[in-house]
């Protein structure tokens, strides 16, 4: 029997996740079905409930539902709790839905391993203050940059994130208008 997985978001048509996961499953001789699901803005909980009730095993969560997924999870990993955002929901053997956030691990692994970028003592600019940014900040701060600036259209969101992660390093929030060429 194939395990059921999906990526959910809005929009979702651009996602390459189904293609990538099917290729990976084939390489690992795993039997799985991986689909993309467009979810209406107020339907996250209903869609996630139906997916898991119908035997679904795991969901990848993208824009704009990462904070909804954090609220949905019955238990969360340390990094998901720090981010207060979830991009991965998995039904455990005991039935509990666990939320994790792998955004930061993926980004830092790519920057260090594939691009050979050193982040320690560097100045980092992050554009935006949504769920993906929540997921990357702790992993970036763990690399001990000189500082991180979060720039966002809505300055209050950037400031809120800078306060949330202030205990982990030097982090500032500002509006996009405050950036100087």
What residue spans do the PLM features occupy?
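Phosphate/diphosphate ligand-binding glycine-rich loop within oxidoreductases
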Residues: 2-115
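Glycine-rich adenosine-cofactor-binding loop
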Residues: 9, 101-104, 111, 115-145, ...
């Amino acid at each position: 029997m194939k395990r059921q997985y999906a990526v959910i978001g809005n929009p979702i048509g651009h996602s390459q996740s189904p293609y990538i996961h099917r290729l990976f499953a084939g390489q690992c001789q795993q039997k799985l079905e991986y689909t993309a699901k467009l979810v209406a803005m107020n339907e996250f909980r209903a869609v996630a409930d139906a997916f898991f009730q119908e035997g679904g095993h795991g969901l990848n969560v993208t824009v704009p539902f990462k904070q909804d997924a954090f609220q949905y999870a019955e238990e969360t990993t340390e990094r998901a709790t720090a981010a207060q955002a979830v991009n991965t929901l998995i039904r455990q053997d005991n039935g509990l839905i666990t939320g994790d956030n792998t955004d930061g691990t993926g980004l830092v692994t790519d920057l260090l391993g594939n691009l050979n970028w050193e982040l320690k003592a560097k100045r980092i600019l992050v554009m935006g203050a949504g769920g993906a940014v929540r997921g990357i900040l702790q992993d970036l701060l763990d690399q001990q940059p000189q500082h991180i600036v979060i720039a966002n259209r809505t300055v209050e969101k950037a400031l809120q994130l800078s306060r949330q992660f202030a205990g982990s390093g030097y982090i500032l929030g500002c509006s996009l208008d405050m950036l100087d060429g």
